[in-house]
């Protein structure tokens, strides 16, 4: 006995930010190496990404080294290899981690939009990224050079930048001068003149050396001077022409000083006297001056006193020119005491004049190529450079070079620098005040080093993730919250600042609520997912294919290890920073590749898939694996038609069935012999595998009553998956019943279908009783049959029940065959006496009727009361018959009828021998005449145009109209002509509805008519030929546009429709029937839906069908509850309206008077049933009651008490009724009341004033609607009304949201994609239709494709329509109070109302589309909902698609379900938050209830211990503590808390329980209703799981994690994701706990017995 009780295992799923400790707690070990698998052994590397020690063994129950093998060692850790012996399944579960050497920012929190880290820290996102990625800042700053360091540590000549200088200058005393930086100096230095070089050196004011190279070009006058002369001048002196350089000089003779020998040296011009050998004298040498000659011969002996030389006079040397004196190189002089110079060796003295001189300053470090005194020629190089590139100079220094080297270099006084930036993480309070900096400010590293120089350790800054981590650790969230809240009070609610603060406040509150520490957003350790989720697979050729994740992990590990190494090696800061940045980037790529910077790609340039990519999108974890799973016990095959099957059967190929039911067959074979041994199992398996007969016998048994599910993709609605009872067939194709093709949208041109086997008894029961195809005949979209005969069946039935053309002319008495019974007629037919279509007389139910045998045959299968012996059954008639049968007899009889129709239809379609040939397309003789007439009219129009009576636009419109009329006439003539022969096969097909339509027939045998060009504009040349005659070349060419457009359209449509369906399902999936009755008194007024252009979109009866009444319906005549005379049904509240009721109520109206007088007898008064007003006035208690006052019980009581006996009143019976006619005033053309208007007292008085006596009205009908349902979750049965698929009230648990989405989305592919042009030039608005229009409405687009229309905001009349000179139109509307409202009509749209027309609020005054959001803002929710309903419905109705209103209403309800918080009062929500309407109502109710207990709470809280400290803002705006944690609450503390506006105190009870007491009344939430587009509504759902699985997965998850969001699994998707039964249908708790017991053995034994 198996009892299956089902309880929800998971009640909620929470998502949070993981702390580093949590990440490490998940892990089974640290991954230290980037290696994966050893290339030789193919075993995982130790400590690598696939390490067995961390992740578990690769072989089941076997350690890595093989020491322990087998399950008996389970749990043992091998001491050799360290691997724990367990199942290899562990490799899917066990995680590792990587300890990061440097912290890294989690890219989700940085790059969410808007960035969470940025909002929380109050740092701009760009700046924040810059800090994290060690970025820089481009700064243009001035250069300054220290000229006087004074007492500072600066060196003279050192460089400072403006930013540093400003910081130093505040505290230090030193002098600077603006500087410049030298750019592109010309090198080398080349002399521009020939001349002599002079070199000198000097120091600048910054103590730097300049070498001066002077080159001079000189003119010289040479004056020879001789030894012995005395110079009057010295080198460099200036002399004038005629000055004496040397004065005239008398030279005396030389006499011998002693006896000796004379030696004369002519070369050196000397004379020497050597003494005698006996003498003690030393030799004496005389230098002979110029002009002195010896008078004694050489080597002669002389006596003391002998004359040796002659005496002479040396002439004076006179300067021949003025100039500077320069001594020649060979001149040797000796200074004398009187300042003159004696010439020692003869030489030249020059008088020089400088012709040209150049100075070349060279900065220190330049290499000089010349020496002092060198003679150089022009163009010779002096030095390698005069300045270095990027040399910095003070302005004074710059001027020197600027003067000597003009235009040979450029200088910049400002320099652009890329400065690394840092963020301040710590700052002393005093320093903060002094510098104006605070924690979180971003400065450049230059500024930082300046501050560090000045303040030492009182300021700290850092960059990269570690800096952000420090900032986050510094945050005191409680304090921050208080600060933001106090600031919010000071700024305007709508300002941008307020929005920023609110976003920040939300994050702070979320972090507090989820108890998340902000620094957890910075990763210290990274989890490594289990290896089997990122496998490596060996491909042929011995290579390995690996998952992208492994590559990404490898990059992280490599960079992390390299960073460690670099750090240990004490590498330079810049290298370490770069490595840290690379590590950050590697982790970013791992988490979300491509979000920051360029994506990491593989060899082929494909971006690698990161962890985020594994979650998001169609191929992500959510949509691919959690919401879409693969199914076991399934198969697929091609389908073929199975005409012999019953509607609930399908043919299953034997092979396929055997494979699907193999386990069942095996179990049955084993059960038969009660064997369980292994050999028995093997044997029985062999029986199955060898396909022995007994296997098939068992299969036949098992399959009986075991339904299978068939599904055809695309699964657009629930009818695409139905249950059938399988029949075993030969062959390989599944046989499908032809009548279930429409719901599956299947045909037999190669379609495939999938089969699924429901396994458990509960699943089989559901399949059998809910999903069997015979219970799915009626479509849940519109409540009409969908499993319908078509094509050949319709043709067969039509052929069976049709008659010849003379049938009606034959009189009864002239009919040859008369039968006493149907059997007799059958006999005659069998023997060939009569044919199917011969008129015969037959006695049926005691009356003789004229019919045909065919009609008798068909009537035989029809339920008795619907038999009609004189009707030809086409498609429509069959549909009506099926629907009537369903309503009267239910679904089983209907299914049987359908099967009978199918059998008859196929049989007689075969017998009919229907064929088609080209000659069957008769061409009407009228055709030619109609075309000729049209041509004649066209030439008249052309003539008028030529004469200028018509504009081109008018001519075009007329032409189109003429041809359109002609085409229509040809169509009618053709059909009529073909129909003259009822047996014409083409006519049979078209008239029966089997195939083809009048339009196609027109093209084949009439004329093709007008075509559209690619833009959608109609081409004015029609195609006059038809396909039977053949088209001309031009005609064929014109017609290609449409064909091509059609093909392109279809392809586009499919994907758009699919996406629309997906969004609709997403927005509505959680709408389930949760309760039978929400008890609401509200509802919507039933009305005829008319679109803005006045076309009826939906009749009243269709609006009412399937609804439940919210209020009693009163008969306008009698004011009693309305009763249906046909069935006696009373229309009271909670009555469900079926088809017949809807027809009755939709067409019921009566004429009643507008007003009448009435007397109320005050002695025994009764309140009138209708609205009444006083005619006579009276005074009571000093108050005057005038005529026109509404009469109620209060007035009657006062009138009685005032002494009156009778009260005359005017009764208005029409008030509160709905007009079904338009009443126009006789005086002017003003409409007094319009069709479908609810008549109010003012309207009634206006009618009375215009002497209207009576009006045709219907009762006001208020029906329940999902739009007004007040169920907390989902909707209730009564507001939803009828379940359209079975015409009973909907059951609790039905997933009506999904059904609604499918009903709307499924016909999406039938809608057109086109934007039609209203003919002519594009000035008139294009009308958006079909799918784009539906999407525009569901997505509540702000930008519309067509111009925006104008609507009225009041009820009134069009007083006037005025056009000014510029062509702008204005519409003036007079409301019922007589006020005038003016509306400007934009030039792009036309006025769509007329003067005197009555206008209701929300009604269009012009063409163009109206924005639903505008209606919501200016009018109300009901009008908006009705507008959306009308417009969306119109899109589908135009395309001939019938969908019940309630499906649209569910989507509209979801779009309008959210409210926007304007003022959150004292809740934790923020302005701008979107919440569910019912939730807000509940919260507000709760707040108001709790406010009552404030006084009691204040008493209770005294004496309790504070669990959290109390902080508030004091008078100065400072955040202060009122009471610390852990103290006892006293009266004084309570008083302070109340004064500070603290509304709640959290305390500990005596038993340590933590309780929150409210001590001040709280404000409820103020909100406004919002209209959300479906995509937004999907994302704005309560649960994060379903939002994350829809779109923007990373964003949703990021926000949810910060919030610590809890998903209570209320919707369907959430439960599918966690793998539970969905809370709908039998998965609801109320059904889920029903016990289902399966007793297979018992049943078996009974069978045997």
UniProtKB/Swiss-Prot annotation:
It catalyses: RNA(n) + a ribonucleoside 5'-triphosphate = RNA(n+1) + diphosphate. The keyword rRNA processing does not apply. Zn(2+) 2 binds at residues 1078, 1269, 1276, 1279. SMART domains: RPOLA_N. InterPro entries: DNA-dir_RpoC_beta_prime (IPR045867), DNA-dir_RpoC_beta_prime_bact (IPR012754), RNA_pol_asu (IPR000722), RNA_pol_N (IPR006592), RNA_pol_Rpb1_1 (IPR007080), RNA_pol_Rpb1_3 (IPR007066), RNA_pol_Rpb1_3_sf (IPR042102), RNA_pol_Rpb1_4 (IPR007083). The RNAP catalytic core consists of 2 alpha, 1 beta, 1 beta' and 1 omega subunit. When a sigma factor is associated with the core the holoenzyme is formed, which can initiate transcription. This is DNA-directed RNA polymerase subunit beta'. Its cofactor is Mg(2+); Zn(2+). CDD domains: RNAP_beta'_C, RNAP_beta'_N. The keyword Transcription applies. GO terms for molecular function: DNA binding; DNA-directed RNA polymerase activity; magnesium ion binding; zinc ion binding. It is an enzyme of class 2 (transferase). Keywords: DNA-directed RNA polymerase, Magnesium, Metal-binding, Nucleotidyltransferase, Transcription, Transferase, Zinc. It comes from Thermosipho melanesiensis (strain DSM 12029 / CIP 104789 / BI429). Mg(2+) binds at residues 747, 749, 751. DNA-dependent RNA polymerase catalyzes the transcription of DNA into RNA using the four ribonucleoside triphosphates as substrates. One of its GO terms (biological process) is DNA-templated transcription.
